[in-house]
Amino acid sequence: TPVSRETMDRCPGIRLIAVMATGYNIVDYTYAREKGIPVVNVPSYGTQIVGQYAVSLLLEICSHIGYHSETVKAGKWEKNPDWCYWDHPMIELYGKTAGIVGLGRIGQATAKILNALNMKVIAYDAHQSPQGAELAEYVDLDTLWARSDVIFLHCPLFPETQGIINRDTIEKMKDGV
């Protein structure tokens, strides 16, 4: 349930807003701060699984795992004239560059997995940390758009980040990113 300015005004005794998730973009954070109401979240909730899921989606796009699983079950491999069955070109991730926008907990979890795949990891984050610097090379956004073969968005949805992928940023990206 969103916690808007109106909601806070209807609850004059509110002393704390605790969001049971990783982000708090459902809260009018600026207004809460103006009223002196702390806003907290559960920062480590889902960290590892979200990173794992993000990379799983990339692996599906690159390897067509679901499609190949279904076609093997349907007998296409058996009907293949040679021992090698694949029905779509696959994309090898080794040596490719992954760009991560937002290198907080989830971005770092994602970076660890991408590093294990021997990908070059670059990242943009307004709040650079030593932990993040061990996992990725910090770059500005224009560099990230230009150098990345794949891009992950692990940033909160704020007015500054809404629409971050748009015509202008897409024009700065490699073809096929």
Model-derived segments and their meaning:
Residues T1-V40, A146, N166:
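An N-terminal-biased, well-structured beta-alpha scaffold segment characteristic
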Residues R33-Y45, K174-V177:
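Rossmann-fold dehydrogenase core element
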Residues I26-Y31, Y67-N80, M119, Q128:
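Mobile beta-alpha loop/short-helix "lid" or hinge segments that flank ligand
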Residues P38, E60, K120:
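Residue-level detector of anion-binding/catalytic polar loops
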Residues Y85-D175:
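Rossmann-like dinucleotide/phosphate-binding beta-alpha-beta segment
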Residues A21-N25, S44-T47, H127, L144:
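Short, acidic/turn-prone active-site loops that include or flank metal/cofactor-
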